[in-house]
Design a protein with these regions (language model features):
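N-terminal, post-signal peptide beta-strand-biased segments of exported outer-membrane/organellar beta-barrel
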Residues: 16-122, 346-350, 355
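Outer-membrane beta-barrel porins/channels
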Residues: 20-29, 98-394
C-alpha cells in the first residue's frame, strides 16, 4: 500500500509541477493562520517541515480562494467607459489545481521517528491593476495595465524527532524536532495593457527550515509546543526587465508560534503566531523618490479548536480565529510603486482585522486509519475567502 501511495504521490506532484496562498489549508485558515507549532497536520510539509516528524503516512489536499484586484470596465455617463479595480474572490490558477497537495511518509519507528514529506503549494496569487507614472507630480492614477502572477513551490523535506525525556514523563523540554525542505519555485507572469500582452514563466530554487520544541507536557491536561519556521526567498531571472514591466520575486518569511493543549484529555487547542513577510525586497524600488515602495508585512494570529466526541469513531472540531493582517502598503490612499508602475486598486485599509471560522469532521475506519474533511472561511478583508481540505491516512 505504501509503495502504491508513493507512486501516486510522485506522479501527482510531477503533473502539478508541470501544470504549475498565504495561509494554506482549511484548518490553518479557520484558526486565523496560526500554524507554526502544529505537529499533527500534513500541511506542515509547507508550513513548518519539523511538524511532520512524528506523523503517520498520510495525504492532504486543500483548495482555497484568493483576493484579487482585477481591472474591470463599467459603463459611465453617456457613452463613456469607466475602469474599476474592486477586490474580488478568485480561485487558484488553474482553478482545478489544488492550492496544496502533499504527502507524509513515516520511515522511522516509534523509538526514532523520521518522516519524509513532498508537496506542491501555491501560497500567493497576485492580480494588481497599475498605472505607468511618467511625471513625479502626477495627481490622478488610472488603471492602464494589469499584472497577474502566480507563485508555486514544489518541496521535498525530511524531519527528525529527538526525545529529551521518556514518553509519559511529566516535565519541561520533552522533545525537539528539526526539519529541512528543498524547493523548486515556479511563477507564471502575465502583463496586459499599454499595448502589451505578454506572458512568461520562470523557475528558481529555495529552501525552508523549521524546528518544534515540546516546551511542557503533563500527558493529561496541559501541553505547550513552540514552533519556528523560515522559508527562503525565490528569485526569478525573468526574460522581461522589471525596470520596464512590473514583476515580483517570491518573498522570504519567518514564523514563530505556540500551541497550547488544555483541559482533561486536551480537547482544547489554542494557537498564537507571528509572521514576517519580506515584500519590500521582492519588487523594484520606485522610479520616483516621492512615491512609497512595497513594505514588509507583520501578521499576528490567534486560533481556537475544540474536539467534540460524536461517537467512538467520529469527532467534530469547531474552530475560530482572529488575524491582524498587514497589507504590503503603508497608506491605502497612497499605494506603493514598483519601478515606474503604481498600484491602482480599491482597498479598505492598510491593516485588517480578520475573523476566521471553520469546522472539521474526522472519523476512523475499521482499519484504524483516520480521515478528515475541513471547511474554513474568513471575513474582514477586502474580500471574503474560503478553503476546503481533505486529509487521509494510508
Amino acid at each position: 500500500m505504501k509503495s502504491l501511495m508513493t507512486s501516486i504521490a510522485l506522479l501527482s506532484l510531477a503533473a502539478t509541477a508541470v501544470a504549475q496562498d498565504q495561509q494554506l489549508g482549511a484548518r490553518t485558515k479557520a484558526m486565523g493562520g496560526s500554524y507554526t507549532a502544529f505537529e499533527d497536520d500534513p500541511v506542515s510539509v509547507w508550513l513548518n517541515p519539523a511538524g511532520i516528524s512524528t506523523q503517520p503516512d498520510q495525504l492532504s489536499i486543500a483548495y482555497q480562494t484568493y483576493t484579487a484586484y482585477p481591472k474591470g470596465r463599467v459603463r459611465g455617463p453617456g457613452d463613456t467607459v469607466d475602469f474599476t479595480v474592486e477586490p474580488s474572490t478568485v480561485m487558484g490558477d488553474p482553478a482545478l489545481l489544488p492550492s496544496y497537495i502533499g504527502f507524509v511518509f513515516q520511515v522511522g519507528d516509534a523509538a526514532a521517528p523520521l518522516a519524509i514529506g513532498v508537496c506542491y503549494a501555491q501560497p500567493y496569487l497576485l492580480n494588481y491593476a497599475m498605472d505607468q507614472v511618467k511625471d513625479p507630480n502626477q495627481p490622478v492614477f488610472v488603471p492602464e495595465a494589469e499584472v497577474q502572477q502566480v507563485f508555486g513551490r514544489f518541496r521535498i523535506s525530511a524531519a527528525k524527532d529527538f526525545r529529551i525525556s521518556d514518553v509519559g514523563t511529566e516535565g519541561f523540554f520533552t522533545h525537539v524536532s528539526a526539519g529541512l525542505g528543498l524547493d523548486v519555485g515556479y511563477t507564471r507572469w502575465h502583463f496586459s495593457g499599454l499595448g502589451e500582452d505578454t506572458t512568461t514563466s520562470n523557475v528558481g530554487v529555495g529552501f525552508g527550515i523549521g524546528g518544534l520544541l515540546g516546551v511542557y507536557d503533563n500527558y493529561n491536561s496541559f501541553k505547550v509546543n513552540l514552533g519556528v519556521a523560515y522559508t527562503s526567498k525565490v528569485s526569478y531571472d525573468f526574460q522581461i526587465d522589471p525596470d520596464i514591466l512590473p514583476a515580483f520575486d517570491m518573498p522570504q518569511q519567518l514564523n514563530v508560534g505556540f500551541t497550547f493543549y488544555l483541559l482533561q484529555g486536551t480537547p482544547l487547542r489554542i494557537t498564537l503566531d507571528f509572521q514576517w513577510i519580506d515584500w519590500s525586497s521582492t519588487a523594484q524600488e520606485p522610479l520616483f523618490s516621492n512615491f512609497d515602495g512595497f513594505e514588509d508585512a507583520m501578521n499576528y494570529s490567534i486560533g481556537f479548536e475544540y474536539r467534540l466526541t460524536v461517537s467512538e469513531r467520529v469527532s467534530l472540531y469547531p474552530r475560530l480565529g482572529f488575524r491582524l493582517f498587514d497589507a504590503p502598503w503603508s497608506d491605502k490612499d497612497d499605494l506603493p510603486m514598483t519601478g515606474p508602475f503604481r498600484l491602482v486598486l480599491d482597498t479598505k485599509d492598510e491593516v485588517f482585522t480578520l475573523f476566521t471560522y471553520g469546522v472539521g469532521i474526522s472519523w476512523t475506519t475499521e482499519a484504524g486509519k483516520v480521515r478528515s474533511v475541513d471547511f474554513a472561511g474568513d471575513a474582514g478583508g477586502d474580500a471574503i475567502n474560503f478553503a476546503i481540505g481533505l486529509t487521509m491516512e494510508f
